[in-house]
Amino acid sequence: MSGDTAFYELGACTNFSFLEGAAPAEEMVVFAKKARLAGLGIADRNSVAGVVRAHAKAKMENYPFQPGARLVFADGTPDVLAYPRNRRGWGHLCRLLSAGNLRSKKGDCTLHLADLLEWQEELLLIVMPDRVRPEPESLKPLLGKLQEHAGNRLYLGLAPRYDGFDRHDFAVLATVARKAGIGLLATNDALYHDPDYRPLADVVTAIREHVPVAGAGFLLQKNAERHLKSPREMARLFSDYPEAIANTQKFFRHLAFSLDELRHQYPDENAGGETPAESLRRLVSEGAAERYPEGVPEKVQRQIEYELELINDKKYEPYFLTVHKLVKFARSEKILCQGRGSAANSSVCFCLGITDVDPQKFTLLFDRFLSKDRDEPPDIDVDFEHERREEVIQYIYRTYGKEHAGLAAAVISYRSRSAGREVAKAFGFSEDVQSALVSSIWGWGNSPFTEEQARGAGLDAADPSTRRVLAYASLLMNYPRHLSQHVGGFVITRDRLDEVVPIMNTAMPDRYMIEWDKDDLDELKILKVDVLALGMLTCLAKGFKLLEAHYGEPITLAEIYQDHQPAVYDMICRADTVGVFQIESRAQMSMLPRLQPREMYDLVIEVAIVRPGPIQGNMVHPYLKRREGQRKGEKVKYPSPELKAVLERTLGVPLFQEQAMQIAITAAGFSPSEADRLRRAMATFKRTGTIHTFERKMVEGMVANGYEREFAERCFNQIKGFGEYGFPESHAASFASLVYASAWLKTYYPDIFCAALLNAQPMGFYAPAQLVRDAREHGVKVLPVDINHSDWDALLEGEGQFRKESVDPRHADMREVIKTRKAVRLGFRLVKGLKQADMGALVACRGEGYRSVHDLWFRSGLSRSVLERLADADAFRSLGLDRRAALWAVKALDEQSAVERLPLFEGAGSLDLRAEPKVALPEMPAGEQVIHDYRTLTLSLKAHPVSFMREDFSRTGILRSRDLAATATGKWVTVAGLVLVRQRPGSANGVIFMTIEDETGIANIIVWEKTFRKYRPQVMGSRLVKIRGRLQNQSGVIHVVADHLEDITPMLGLLRREARRFGANDRADGALRPSGDAREKRKLRQLRLGLPGGAEPEGEAAAQVAEAMPKGRNFH
């Protein structure tokens, strides 16, 4: 400290004091060290969510740090800074915060003084007087009560307010402390590290208080002084109270706790007096006998012994037993589940039934999962059916209790959209301007705001207010907004979890989470079990049930994995993969005809190769070239026999993280632990840049082993190209099995596949409209939602519904393969606004069927609003009622006649079924029907919206999607359609891939970055788009490379050109009036003739139609 008084700041908070603190924990630590503070304590508001980040940074900086919390009470008690002086004290702090969390809704913590008195043991406490004006008389009884319990562990905090009254207030508080016999302690009560962050603190205050900065007044800090100050400056400020500075050192030195003391205690999973090691060995032995019924191969047995020995050395047996217990429970309940990720490298996991990939078949690397040289717990991810995962979660709570099991947190941070909107609001920008500013932002990214985006929103980029919004929105990005629950990471402990970390309620009943996220847990080496949800498992489970129920063919995933059918691979090679797991995206479909998968390992490669890692590492084209050469009989040359063993399965091109590790071990002399550090560096190099530290060792190691320097450098650059996107082979292998299973189901039973996909929504790449279209192209008859035939889920019905000639010519090869005989009846789940419980009542009361709208209303007890939704969805056709007639009948129901449902009338036979009287209503035109279908169901079985424009499109030279296959490559073409998908992969250098749809199918569009910048509003905002560009046809994969885009969404108004207005809020008994005024008709005429971009805005009718159409899904 060289002459400076030792000062320890204990009142600092971070941005984990949500919308109060204005700096990240890591930056607080770095700045504190730079400012020569002797040590730093972090005390966030009723939370320890940010302390692990500070702890990790402090260890890296070799800087003294202590975790604590600022206790803010609901009963008027002044704030108290609480710090644990040992491990027991930390447990008490966690129990105290947990008590406040569990009595509150998610995000709140309701503390009372009684909580502190109950849990104050082993805590050092600093009472912080009110910042507005200290009230000594109210402090006296509080200090007396706390001193009675805490004794010399209690201090009174002095924090300057820089308002001219500090000298007076300090004197008053010093008197109170002296009379109470407690010490004074100095703090600057820091909200941020650097005074330059004061404006950001004002912005977060305005966001928190829901007022603009300009109107926040006294809510804002009076100055920029609440930052980390140097010891010299603090000594000057407290020159009259040097003991307050000295006491910070005394206080800090009594804190002997470190977060590194937290150790995960695994639950006891002993059975029948066995030790965990004995139980695990027995279960693995039994599982191995099942996996290898003809005897366990010697190589596999050696691997099992090696893994069990390492697991025993690490004392991880209880962890494996816990995961096995969860999987065993799921299977006992017939819940489909499958382990994935690095656990698929383990033969023990395979034998326990946790994973379904035999590591010996895929040459997987166990050290990727668990290493003797790596001091960290293994990470096992298990996917469960997403609709039934809650059963597994509740089993965990029933088995272990919330005191021993909790979900990890997920830190929800500000992204571009949320930061832009909130900051613009804080600076008083109108809601329209806020929306315009964020509308051009891609997805949920966190790229800084640009002046180009501001100008695109109609703002003056040179205006000081605009510049402030851009600057502070960019600064706020990645700041935490709140804690949410992790997608499935569970921490399960033997000792009380709420003495390790505070637990809290979630937004869902009977679920509890902790305050730390997965990175915090990794830092502290606290083990979690990932209980994840996967929609495709739900789809397959429902599909298997339909297969057994309707076709009498029970089947399991394991049986499908063994059933490698050429017809399945034929379908995959044609890229006929809409709905198929992992290979349904535009990029995957483009790769399939070139890769030509013919076996399971080809699917492993397919899953992994269309990823940013292989693309950025320049591995895709070399691999495809060698695969083409292999088909021609060409041999691959390898630099050495050792590398051939590593790379032969991928034709000499490293595609997986495991191969990068094996190259380092085999060719460069790395130890397994060094190779694993290389893998970690690959995973984080974009954030930390540490991969370069391995370059010299790897290149020189390979040269020393006889490899050419140029080859060694190229090898390293390929590995570096993986970046944080490198794909583990074990993960790809786990997913490849689900690729095949879903493709198998689609190949033979497209009716089941369609129904199962619809019943597993939301999931996947495509909306229900595209799934239904694809099923119909494969000859599946799809029937509409109907009150007398539908259930909540889609059903199969009828026999002999499949006709070979109904299969689209593009899938003609499937006509002799498809085994479908059923039709798919759409389920009520597709109707917007309906509840499953209501539809359950409808089905339960249906009996022989409903005879009228009144009959349905009377017997089911459903409200009229529910019946209106059903009528809107055109679900009364079995009664002979079209949409308008059904709405008329529902509207005619007299709410007063609810008395008819009284017991007096039950079974009396006094009521007729009241068949709806015939009313002559104008027929709803086809275009209007389609609009309503999309509005209520997001799809239409009657027609595609674009079909109503085809005449106009054909006159202006717009091709159908189907016609592109017969068009010469390189030719200029114009296409138009509804925007289904926009995809902007991180590896694509700003390129956008769009998928549009017309009445004949889909067209894939490539939008280069330069074109995207020029037509950004059209790409991002169009629901119906017209595109001119050059056709590319490579190996049957067709794209249009866009040169010009035009938003023709107003043309959707053409669906109503023959219709009368019958909008979302109109009903059949409403006045039927002409559609649109002369001005609107004039616009529609202009549209039919080809409305130029940027012409008049669409009329009201066109806007209503556009609102009913899909916006398009955005993917990264």
UniProtKB/Swiss-Prot annotation:
GO CC terms, sorted: cytoplasm
GO molecular function: 3'-5' exonuclease activity; DNA-directed DNA polymerase activity; nucleic acid binding
Catalytic activity: DNA(n) + a 2'-deoxyribonucleoside 5'-triphosphate = DNA(n+1) + diphosphate
Name under which the protein is recorded: Error-prone DNA polymerase
EC number: 2.7.7.7
Protein family membership: Belongs to the DNA polymerase type-C family. DnaE2 subfamily.
Database matches in HAMAP family: DNApol_error_prone
